[in-house]
């Protein structure tokens, strides 16, 4: 059984991006710029934003964080986005989720210039993904990170049966569309399971590649997995654990110990898919920089 080490691959990728950023700094005197907007003071969101800013700094990319109070009107946020759309030094715009209830998340997504939508959530980018124009869009960072892991670990995908458990707009839907594309690291037959699927194990047991992204701790158990399957665990769930200092620990959507005994390869939680998400955000921002500057 092979452990797919997202921590290592994300660091490898960041090192590669750092080299590219240094090259552009030396050759044209410019570097990519990412701006993150956070509305309110959600502790988890603040941690995510700090991690993104730290990763930008690590590779020499310019990073700006705009903090807005929890009661910010929607129009104020939209105006800030419109200004960033016009700023030539900003190549990536990300609005940290979740947003306060007075703000329509879809309206915010629509306001971001698709050419700077490095989260890959704008309908134009999703539409290009569905149509197979991956060279003209941004792919959502978590699915893109999973694709990078499969590629770098030389996981055979062509003609394989990929089962995606979960249908969120952030992971499940773009992941399923990505895995059916005609790419070296995809080209699968794809099945999507969700909360209304009857007899989910009957589908997961057919999977050559099983991607769990439903947000339920240890939902996928050994009796739901085909021996030799590649298992990608997207879930991050807190469960109580009195033996730890914090009183909890992180587990995925997969019962790791039981499934690892059967799988040919598996991502751990933490240290699997999670680290790849920020790395792919940086990669998307660099790609935006290249496109905007015709590089």
Swiss-Prot record:
<keyword id="KW-0560">Oxidoreductase</keyword>
<dbReference type="InterPro" id="IPR020630">
    <property type="entry name" value="THF_DH/CycHdrlase_cat_dom"/>
</dbReference>
<dbReference type="Pfam" id="PF02882">
    <property type="entry name" value="THF_DHG_CYH_C"/>
</dbReference>
<dbReference type="GO" id="GO:0009086">
    <property type="term" value="P:methionine biosynthetic process"/>
</dbReference>
<dbReference type="GO" id="GO:0004477">
    <property type="term" value="F:methenyltetrahydrofolate cyclohydrolase activity"/>
</dbReference>
<dbReference type="InterPro" id="IPR046346">
    <property type="entry name" value="Aminoacid_DH-like_N_sf"/>
</dbReference>
<protein>
    <recommendedName>
        <fullName>Bifunctional protein FolD</fullName>
        <ecNumber>1.5.1.5</ecNumber>
        <ecNumber>3.5.4.9</ecNumber>
    </recommendedName>
</protein>
<dbReference type="GO" id="GO:0035999">
    <property type="term" value="P:tetrahydrofolate interconversion"/>
</dbReference>
<dbReference type="InterPro" id="IPR000672">
    <property type="entry name" value="THF_DH/CycHdrlase"/>
</dbReference>
<feature type="binding site">
    <location>
        <begin position="166"/>
        <end position="168"/>
    </location>
    <ligand>
        <name>NADP(+)</name>
    </ligand>
</feature>
<keyword id="KW-0521">NADP</keyword>
<keyword id="KW-0028">Amino-acid biosynthesis</keyword>
<dbReference type="GO" id="GO:0004488">
    <property type="term" value="F:methylenetetrahydrofolate dehydrogenase (NADP+) activity"/>
</dbReference>
<feature type="binding site">
    <location>
        <position position="236"/>
    </location>
    <ligand>
        <name>NADP(+)</name>
    </ligand>
</feature>
<comment type="function">
    <text>Catalyzes the oxidation of 5,10-methylenetetrahydrofolate to 5,10-methenyltetrahydrofolate and then the hydrolysis of 5,10-methenyltetrahydrofolate to 10-formyltetrahydrofolate.</text>
</comment>
<dbReference type="GO" id="GO:0005829">
    <property type="term" value="C:cytosol"/>
</dbReference>
<dbReference type="Pfam" id="PF00763">
    <property type="entry name" value="THF_DHG_CYH"/>
</dbReference>
<keyword id="KW-0368">Histidine biosynthesis</keyword>
<comment type="subunit">
    <text>Homodimer.</text>
</comment>
<keyword id="KW-0554">One-carbon metabolism</keyword>
<keyword id="KW-0511">Multifunctional enzyme</keyword>
<keyword id="KW-0486">Methionine biosynthesis</keyword>
<dbReference type="GO" id="GO:0006164">
    <property type="term" value="P:purine nucleotide biosynthetic process"/>
</dbReference>
<comment type="pathway">
    <text>One-carbon metabolism; tetrahydrofolate interconversion.</text>
</comment>
<keyword id="KW-0658">Purine biosynthesis</keyword>
<comment type="similarity">
    <text>Belongs to the tetrahydrofolate dehydrogenase/cyclohydrolase family.</text>
</comment>
<feature type="binding site">
    <location>
        <position position="195"/>
    </location>
    <ligand>
        <name>NADP(+)</name>
    </ligand>
</feature>
<dbReference type="InterPro" id="IPR020867">
    <property type="entry name" value="THF_DH/CycHdrlase_CS"/>
</dbReference>
<keyword id="KW-0378">Hydrolase</keyword>
<dbReference type="GO" id="GO:0000105">
    <property type="term" value="P:L-histidine biosynthetic process"/>
</dbReference>
<dbReference type="InterPro" id="IPR036291">
    <property type="entry name" value="NAD(P)-bd_dom_sf"/>
</dbReference>
<dbReference type="InterPro" id="IPR020631">
    <property type="entry name" value="THF_DH/CycHdrlase_NAD-bd_dom"/>
</dbReference>
């Amino acid at each position: 059984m092979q452990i797919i080490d997202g921590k290592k691959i994300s660091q490898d990728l960041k090192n590669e991006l750092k080299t590219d950023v240094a090259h552009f700094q030396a050759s044209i005197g410019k570097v990519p710029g990412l701006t993150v907007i956070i509305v309110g003071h959600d502790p988890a969101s603040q941690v995510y934003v700090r991690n993104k800013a730290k990763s930008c700094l690590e590779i020499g990319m310019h990073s700006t964080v705009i903090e807005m109070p929890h009661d910010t009107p929607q129009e104020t946020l939209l105006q800030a986005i419109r200004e960033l759309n016009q700023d030539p030094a900003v190549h990536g715009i990300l609005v940290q989720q979740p947003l306060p209830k007075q703000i329509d998340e879809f309206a915010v997504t629509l306001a971001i210039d698709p050419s700077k939508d490095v989260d890959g959530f704008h309908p134009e980018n999703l539409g290009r993904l569905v149509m197979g124009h991956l060279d003209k869009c941004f792919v959502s960072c978590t699915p893109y990170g999973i694709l990078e892991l499969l590629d770098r670990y030389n996981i055979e995908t062509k003609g394989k049966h990929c089962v995606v458990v979960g249908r969120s707009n952030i992971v499940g839907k773009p992941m399923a569309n990505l895995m059916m594309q005609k790419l070296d690291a995809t080209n699968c037959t794809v099945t999507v399971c969700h909360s209304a699927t009857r007899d989910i194990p009957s589908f997961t047991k057919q999977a050559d590649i099983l991607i769990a992204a439903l947000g339920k701790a240890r939902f996928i158990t050994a009796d739901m997995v085909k021996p030799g399957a590649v298992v990608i665990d997207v879930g991050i769930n807190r469960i109580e654990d009195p033996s730890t200092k914090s009183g909890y620990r992180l587990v995925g959507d997969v019962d790791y110990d039981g499934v690892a005994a059967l799988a040919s390869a598996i991502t751990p939680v933490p240290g699997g898919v999670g680290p790849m998400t920020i790395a792919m955000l940086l990669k998307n921002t660099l790609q935006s920089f290249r496109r905007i500057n015709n590089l």
